[in-house]
């Protein structure tokens, strides 16, 4: 077993970041247990905890995965270099956001372990509850074994509980990655331009991915029902107007509004 550490910038609201992950877990792949984020990679296991006294993430890696690659992925997933001072100072000006920032200073968008995995999870979650999306992801894992483009293309996804168009969108996404049509190492604007031409990647989906994959600090899915509910507005237009003073950090504002435990 390998045990490593990752230094993080304070403030680092581990409990709230863990809550975000717990609410969106992929069954059989991830779990949150007693303050630890656990991820399985085939037969291997990664566990992450946070030591508040030293401001370090403690990472346990068992199996044959490369520890350096795991540490890099965790660092990106949790954006450990995020400097909260400027962002939180701006968002505290909002009466709506001020109490949320006070309760979880340093909250930032959670990234992704795998761009493909998050893309699939986002398509699956369209127009369904978080609980329903979790159930569908469980079925996908059961059918595919491992959520990679190769396994998704080869899997039988018939009668999995999703509309046929959504299943085809997932398959098209997998094929585009295998063909090299999508390259997540390219600048996000280039990636977004490709996604825009593909089925299943409308404005909401692309804005959400811009937050979590593109690290666009001002991306904002203004049609999101959860954001409208948290902001106490009824329409996307009202939400856009309300969010205007939050620029250029609307993605962080969205993250505070999405947090279910604030």
What is each model feature region?
Residues 1-262:
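HhH-family (HhH-GPD) DNA N-glycosylase catalytic core used in base-excision repair
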């Amino acid at each position: 077993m390998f045990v490593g550490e990752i230094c993080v910038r304070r403030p680092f609201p581990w409990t709230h970041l863990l809550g975000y992950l717990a609410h969106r877990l992929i069954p059989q792949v991830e779990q949150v247990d007693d303050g630890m984020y656990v991820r399985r990679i085939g037969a291997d296991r990664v566990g992450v905890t946070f030591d508040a006294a030293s401001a370090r993430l403690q990472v346990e890696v068992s199996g044959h995965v490369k520890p350096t690659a795991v540490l890099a992925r965790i660092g990106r997933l949790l954006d450990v270099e995020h400097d909260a001072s400027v962002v939180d100072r701006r968002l505290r000006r909002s009466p709506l956001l001020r109490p949320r920032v006070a309760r979880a200073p340093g909250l930032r968008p959670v990234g992704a372990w795998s761009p493909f995995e998050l893309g699939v999870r986002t398509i699956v979650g369209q127009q369904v509850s978080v609980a329903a999306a979790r159930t569908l992801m469980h079925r996908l894992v059961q059918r595919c074994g491992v959520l990679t483009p190769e396994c998704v293309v080869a899997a039988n996804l018939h009668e999995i509980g999703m509309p046929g168009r959504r299943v085809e969108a997932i398959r098209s996404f997998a094929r585009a990655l295998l063909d090299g049509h999508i390259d997540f190492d390219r600048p996000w604007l280039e990636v977004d331009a490709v996604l825009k031409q593909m089925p299943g990647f409308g404005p909401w989906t692309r804005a959400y991915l811009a937050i979590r994959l593109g690290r666009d600090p001002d991306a904002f899915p203004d049609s999101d029902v959860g954001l409208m509910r948290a902001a106490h507005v009824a329409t996307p237009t009202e939400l856009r107007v309300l969010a205007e003073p939050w620029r250029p950090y609307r993605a962080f504002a969205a993250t505070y509004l999405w947090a279910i435990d604030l």
